[in-house]
């Protein structure tokens, strides 16, 4: 056992990849076999991650020597790399297929989500601009929230709330999309492109459209992918400045 502990502590980052991989494997198994894909595997993995964050001390589970590599894997370097990697999978020329409506939906979706989240933060009792901006960004997606919070120097508690906010949005989108699809006439690729731009949470949009019509998934995912990148640009800069002026 001591030999195993020494090997893991020496190769902390490798073990962190293995540990997160096992969580993802378990999460997607639960999503597929127990929840009938009604909740995305990514959302379940985030819930597990947030739960594990309460273990340890200030730095969460990474304070436990056995899981020290999580601190590196969960740091800003790998986080930003993941975001860039996601954006690289989308061809910028393809967004033109959505026309002006697709572009407008991105800006409208991010703006509505951000200021709705900011209002929720104020109702929750937060008064400082950094916290309000971070939680507002979390209402865009659970990636935009921590990116914005880190950029502005928000507390770990506020960043966790922003992630939780985005997670609720993802689960809600997954469940409600197939229910309201016919009512909002979400029936063709053009509709899916606008829908992805308005909602933005990629995993929620993909899961929701998959339950509605699998042929619509690539189109919704297209604009939803750009949503995260655009949110990471707007929230800690322009939207933050807007809130400071209000």
Q: What do these predicted ranges mean?
A:
Residues 7-20, 66-82, 108, 128-137, ...:
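Structural signature of hydrophobic alpha-helical transmembrane segments
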Residues 104-145, 172-187:
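Transmembrane alpha-helices that form the ion-translocation and gating core
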Residues 49-54, 67-97, 143:
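Hydrophobic transmembrane alpha-helices of secondary-active transporters
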Residues 1-10, 246:
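Short, strongly hydrophobic alpha-helical membrane anchors
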Residues 9, 13-20, 73, 92-118, ...:
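Entry/N-cap segments of selected transmembrane alpha helices
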Residues 129-172, 189-226:
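Alpha-helical membrane segments and immediately flanking helix-loop junctions
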Residues 31-39, 61-71, 88-104, 124, ...:
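Interfacial helix-loop-helix linkers and transmembrane-helix boundary segments
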Residues 16-29, 45-56, 82-85, 117, ...:
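Hydrophobic core segments of alpha-helical transmembrane domains in multi-pass membrane transport
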């Amino acid at each position: 056992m001591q030999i195993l502990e020494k090997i893991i502590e020496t190769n902390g980052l490798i073990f962190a990849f293995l540990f997160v991989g096992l969580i993802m494997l378990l999460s997607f198994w639960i999503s597929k076999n127990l929840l009938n894909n009604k909740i995305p595997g990514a959302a379940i993995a985030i819930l597990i991650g947030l739960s594990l964050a309460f273990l340890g001390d200030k730095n969460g589970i990474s304070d436990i020597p056995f899981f020290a590599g999580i601190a590196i894997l969960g740091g800003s370097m790998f986080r930003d790399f993941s975001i860039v990697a996601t954006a690289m999978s989308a061809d910028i020329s393809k967004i033109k297929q959505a026309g002006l409506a697709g572009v407008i939906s991105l800006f409208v979706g991010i703006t509505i989500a951000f200021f709705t989240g900011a209002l929720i933060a104020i109702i929750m009792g937060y008064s400082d601009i950094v916290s309000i901006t971070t939680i507002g960004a979390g209402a865009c997606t659970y990636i935009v929230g921590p990116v914005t919070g880190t950029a502005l120097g928000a507390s770990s508690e506020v960043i966790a709330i922003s992630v939780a906010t985005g997670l609720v949005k993802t689960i809600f989108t997954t469940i409600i999309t197939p229910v309201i699809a016919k009512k909002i006439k979400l029936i063709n690729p053009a509709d899916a492109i606008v829908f992805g731009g308005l909602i933005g949470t990629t995993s929620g949009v993909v899961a929701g459209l998959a339950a509605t019509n699998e042929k619509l998934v690539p189109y919704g995912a297209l604009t939803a992918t750009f949503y995260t990148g655009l949110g990471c640009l707007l929230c800690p800069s322009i939207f933050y400045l807007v809130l400071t002026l209000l």
